[in-house]
Amino acid sequence: FDVVYSVYAVGWTTDLQTTFNLISSYLKKDGSFIFSWDHPFMHCVDETEGRLLFSGSYHEAEPFTFQKHGNPLTLHNRRLCDYINTLSKAGFAIERIVEETDSETMNRDVEFTSGYYSSTKAKKFPLSIIIKARKL
């Protein structure tokens, strides 16, 4: 393929290296891999009564489990360097990293979730990250 893209899916993998290696195997030389996921800060900052508090460590690259609609959900905390270094090991070169939040999200007067994706957070740091990498 010339392009492989993933919209908010890569973060669900339990084995990032294997996932990136497989994606690399599907791409032609110089093909692009573009993906988005929650910004790495998202897992360590909580909002309480309009205040942002560090509730975890950015450095903890470990899986964590929480309840969603009464069911356990496990995700893996990954730092930006985890994505970059794993992409590099899979034969990719980083072409672009986007750390932005759209102005509509930042300017909402009413919070649109229970605090995970919130305008309060969006005004202080990006909620998501987009990485574009090229297969070498």
Predicted regions and their residues:
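Conserved class I S-adenosyl-L-methionine
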Residues: 33-64
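A short glycine-rich, Lys/Arg-flanked "PGG" loop and its adjoining helix->strand segment in the class I
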Residues: 17-32
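Short alpha-helix
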Residues: 73-97
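Generic structural signal for helix capping and beta-alpha/helix-loop junctions
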Residues: 43, 104-106
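Core SAM-dependent methyltransferase catalytic element
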Residues: 90-92, 113-136
